[in-house]
């Protein structure tokens, strides 16, 4: 029997809009992205791949991550959970944060001089690392790559899991890691 195809198909070599877009993520029948308008204001939008309809779902610059049911957003002062179906949004944590990632059923976020881990409802929040200013967190399977600055050691690059076990990368390892990441 022929393979079942969705009602939409991936469009090739077709311009979908003229917006300046960042952080493009495809999830099911939607493409989610950050858009910047002429006044340099950011918003989170999604485009339906079936009818190419675009809707603004959040009116601030943010980082966002998607799982089966929710979109998790960080706007720098709070972490929010948005239902993908009805777009209902609730704050799960009021916290200044520099960056965050979603790993399985955990949210890892950096604030001030700490890296914390909490569950998807904002509970069980605990510190993974102290005395570190994380500039960048990226998911690598079940692990997280962190670029930052430690008060005791200066510039740091490491890989850690959501339990806080980490492996420091030296200069040569970092270059190799970046090459693998870009592959």
What do these predicted ranges mean?
Residues 32-34, 72-73, 109-110, 145-148:
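Residue position within the beta-strands of beta-propeller blades
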Residues 27, 40, 67, 75-76, ...:
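Short loop/turn segments that connect beta-strands within the blades of beta-propeller domains
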């Amino acid at each position: 029997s022929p393979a079942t195809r969705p009602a939409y198909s991936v469009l090739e070599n077709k311009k979908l809009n003229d917006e300046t877009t960042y952080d493009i993520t495809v999830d099911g029948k939607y493409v989610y992205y950050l858009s910047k308008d002429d006044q340099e204001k950011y918003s989170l939008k999604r485009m339906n791949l079936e009818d190419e309809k675009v809707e603004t779902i959040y009116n601030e610059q943010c980082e966002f991550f998607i799982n089966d049911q929710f979109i998790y957003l960080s706007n720098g002062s709070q972490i929010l959970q948005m239902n993908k179906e009805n777009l209902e949004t609730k704050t799960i944590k009021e916290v200044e944060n520099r960056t965050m990632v979603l790993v399985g059923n955990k949210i890892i976020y950096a604030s001030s001089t700490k890296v914390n881990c909490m569950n998807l409802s904002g509970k069980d929040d605990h510190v993974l690392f102290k005395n570190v200013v994380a500039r960048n967190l990226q998911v690598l399977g079940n692990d997280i790559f962190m670029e930052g600055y430690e008060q005791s050691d200066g510039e740091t690059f490491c890989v850690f899991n959501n339990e806080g076990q980490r492996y420091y990368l030296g200069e040569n390892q970092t270059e190799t890691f970046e090459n693998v990441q870009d592959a």
